Amino acid sequence: MVERAMLIGITLPGRDDATTRSLLDELRELVTTLGIGIQHEVQLSIRKPQAKFLLGTGKAEEMIEEAKAHNCDVIVIDNELTPAQQRNWEQAADDKILV
């Protein structure tokens, strides 16, 4: 079964949108090489990284719902997450997270 992915690019403080876009383009190529289809992409900017999800809880929940609405099997995030953040994403999104 071919998986369908939602990619999330996050512009952190100190990084510009063009850099995030470039990293998202690279991520798209890597995911496609793995045989995973890209169903949806989102680029977000955050002012301050949050401990639980990197994004705020409401925004993370919104991204999970958006992935479901686009029939995505997996969410791929272009930033490093702490082990706790990854676990929180996996629990919230039913283990459908790649970092």
Regions found by a protein language model. Give the residues of each.
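N-terminal accessory targeting/assembly segments
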Residues: 1-99
